[in-house]
């Protein structure tokens, strides 16, 4: 008979036959989600022959799957690691360490696997292992737990040898542990288990009349086969409490009786007849049904719940419900309030179906309500929004890397970070324009000349602080109130006259509302939004203002307008973007960072057609 023990030795034998050194691999399970590969490596670093560790992650989200592997050159060190680290705490959670069995047949054949149930809550992995280790070498031992770490009351023990499993079953089954009788039996896969419905003999019935007697029930069920016993539950007045049990000699007779009598009228009521279940079994079934229903409702609510903001503070929940009830049946409405009970200007409306929620978004998004335009969208959890931002940020950075490596000419500045991906705009790189060490300028053919302030080495900065990087190891800054110099090299671009007339000292013109620029192109509108957002973001996160502004510009234009009016909402969005940048693996300080900083300071007011 094949065993896990034999599979392990077979793996070693195959390894020793090759030129590579013999290695031993351990499975490390039940890891805390916060455990990284570095933490995992440090946990096993005391064993000198440790070669590597691997933490398994979800391919789409990158989140830990809470298990991994540790690889050793020495099998002796691996054995020692199991003894020391199994059932030890790592980041506040008890971990499991066992041999890694790569052969699928050896993992799944169930040889030596024992199922234990009705365990007291005090029984942990370590206690369970101590109970069974006297019967033989244990490969794996686990007590099933809930999310909060509490025991589910059952567990599994896998031995190297099948004989050890048989001995454990014979000895420990029906023994008392902490005043509870435990069950120990051979583990069987769900596909191999005999369904209870196929062999039950005991039936439960309810909806009985108070005056029903055992003779009447026996007469009713005797036609299906031999009855072993029949019992009616009675109250203190010897009247039927509405339910009873009947036990047949043959499971087939019991099945036929349940199928035939269930739902039929007996006396004044319709009977329910089904397989009699133990209390623990009924509770487990009810828990599963509740969990299934809860998950179903959760999934429906996830796509049926809408987020509404920019709500007038005078609006009540009842008014909000009445306004949105035009689109369907509302199950709940909630306006968020501060500690004083004053509305925060946003809330949630949950519909009965996802279709109604989508209709509400299409109908009410941007609609005026009590003098303010509503922002309406499908509600998202903070984690989901963060993950979405991470994906968008990662895709944009990859595209930026590929485009910069393929198309950016040497000696040019990359475009502003927040102007990479908006439709309708073609962005060009800006060539270096140095005529001398301290002057820079530009001119435009067939149009007005635009004066750019010169850059002077080591001059004090007056317009922006800490936004200019180092160029040629010298600090540079803008000198205001300068004229067009003849020492400047020309830079040709086809800008509109309106864009030519803008300079960086004209801050008032940058703050014109979007409504006054409806005739401009979509690209110019997004550029202007970027110009308005950038100084606000810079006050919150000076070092990452360019990148965060670019991430915000991926949002809907109507929401961007609301962010400009609401400093609180803007701060929340900036915090979310900062967390995304912080958690990403991307190197935020690229070699050409000073170029982006120069553009952020020097040409943020110029849009390109």
Curated annotation (Swiss-Prot):
Question: Where would I find the RRM domain in this sequence?
Answer: 24-102, 112-189, 201-278, 304-381
| InterPro entries the record matches | Nucleotide-bd_a/b_plait_sf, PABP-dom, PABP_1234, PABP_HYD_C, RBD_domain_sf, RRM2_I_PABPs, RRM_dom, RRM_dom_euk
Q: Which UniProt keywords apply?
A: Cytoplasm, Nucleus, Repeat, RNA-binding, Translation regulation
Q: Which SUPFAM superfamilies match?
A: PABC (PABP) domain, RNA-binding domain, RBD
Q: Name one Pfam family in it.
A: RRM_1
**UniProt entry tagged with the keyword Endoplasmic reticulum:** no
Q: Where is the signal peptide?
A: none
Tissue localization of expression: Expressed predominantly in siliques.
Where mainly found?
A: cytoplasm
Q: Where is the PABC domain?
A: 509-586
SMART domains associated with the record = PolyA (SM00517), RRM (SM00360), RRM_1 (SM00361)
Which GO terms fall under biological process for this protein? regulation of translation
Cell compartment(s), UniProt: Cytoplasm; Nucleus
Mention one GO molecular function: RNA binding
Q: What does this protein do?
A: Binds the poly(A) tail of mRNA. Appears to be an important mediator of the multiple roles of the poly(A) tail in mRNA biogenesis, stability and translation.
PANTHER family of this UniProt entry? RNA BINDING PROTEIN (PTHR24012)
Q: What else is known?
A: A.thaliana contains 8 PABP genes.
Q: What family does this belong to?
A: Belongs to the polyadenylate-binding protein type-1 family.
The name this protein carries in UniProt is Polyadenylate-binding protein 7
Q: Which organism is it from?
A: Arabidopsis thaliana
Provide the gene name from the record: PAB7
């Amino acid at each position: 008979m094949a065993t896990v023990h034999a599979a392990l030795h077979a793996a070693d034998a195959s390894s020793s036959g090759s030129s590579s050194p013999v290695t031993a691999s351990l499975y490390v399970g039940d890891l805390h989600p916060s455990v990284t590969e570095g933490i995992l490596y440090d946990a096993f670093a005391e064993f000198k022959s440790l070669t590597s560790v691997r933490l398994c992650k979800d391919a789409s989200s990158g989140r830990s799957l809470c298990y991994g592997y540790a690889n050793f050159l020495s099998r002796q060190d691996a054995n020692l690691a199991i003894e020391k680290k199994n059932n030890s705490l790592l980041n506040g959670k008890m971990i499991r360490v066992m041999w890694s069995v790569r052969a699928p047949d050896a993992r799944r054949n169930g040889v030596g696997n024992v199922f234990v149930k009705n365990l007291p809550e005090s029984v942990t992995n370590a206690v369970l292992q101590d109970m069974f280790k006297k019967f033989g070498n244990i490969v794996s031992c686990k007590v099933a737990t809930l999310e909060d770490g509490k025991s589910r009351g059952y567990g599994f023990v896998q031995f190297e040898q099948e004989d050890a499993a048989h001995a454990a079953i014979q000895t420990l089954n029906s023994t008392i542990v902490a005043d509870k009788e435990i069950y120990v039996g051979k583990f069987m896969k769900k596909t191999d288990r005999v369904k209870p419905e196929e062999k039950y003999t005991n039936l439960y019935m309810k909806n009985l009349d108070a005056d029903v007697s055992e003779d009447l029930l026996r007469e009713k069920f005797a036609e299906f086969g031999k009855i072993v016993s029949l019992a009616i539950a009675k109250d203190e007045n010897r009247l039927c409490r509405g339910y009873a049990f009947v036990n047949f000699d043959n499971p087939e007779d019991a099945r036929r009786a349940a199928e035939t009598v269930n739902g039929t009228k007996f006396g004044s009521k319709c009977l329910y007849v089904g397989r009699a279940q133990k209390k623990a079994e009924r509770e487990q079934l009810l828990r599963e049904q509740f969990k299934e229903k809860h998950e179903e409702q959760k999934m429906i609510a996830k796509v049926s719940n809408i987020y509404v903001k920019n709500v007038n503070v005078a609006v009540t929940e009842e008014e909000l419900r009445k306004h949105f009830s035009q689109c369907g049946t509302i199950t709940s409405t909630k306006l968020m309030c501060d500690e004083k009970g004053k509305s925060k200007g946003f809330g949630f409306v949950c519909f009965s179906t996802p279709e109604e929620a989508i209709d509400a978004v299409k109908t009410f998004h941007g609609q005026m309500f009590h003098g303010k335009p509503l922002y309406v969208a499908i509600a998202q959890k903070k984690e989901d929004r963060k993950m979405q931002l991470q994906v968008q940020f990662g895709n944009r950075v990859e595209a930026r890397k590929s485009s910069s490596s393929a198309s950016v000419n040497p000696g040019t500045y990359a475009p502003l970070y927040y102007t990479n991906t908006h439709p309708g705009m073609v962005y060009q790189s800006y060539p270096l324009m140095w005529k001398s060490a301290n002057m820079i300028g530009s001119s435009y053919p067939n149009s007005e000349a635009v004066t750019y302030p010169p850059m002077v080495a080591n001059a004090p900065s007056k317009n922006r602080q800490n936004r200019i990087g180092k160029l040629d190891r010298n600090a540079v800054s803008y000198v205001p109130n300068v004229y067009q110099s003849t020492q400047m090299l020309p830079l040709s671009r086809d800008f509109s006259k309106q864009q030519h007339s803008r300079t960086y000292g004209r801050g008032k013109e940058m703050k014109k509302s979007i409504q006054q620029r409806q005739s401009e192109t979509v690209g110019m509108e997004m550029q202007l939004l970027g110009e308005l957002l950038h100084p606000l973001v810079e006050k919150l996160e000076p070092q990452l203002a360019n990148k965060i502004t670019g991430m915000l510009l991926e949002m809907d234009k109507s929401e961007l307008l609301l962010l400009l009016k609401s400093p609180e909402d803007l701060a929340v969005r900036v915090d979310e973007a900062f967390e995304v940048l912080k958690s990403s693996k991307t190197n935020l300080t690229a070699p050409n960072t000073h170029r982006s900083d120069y553009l952020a300071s020097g040409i943020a007011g110029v849009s390109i057609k």
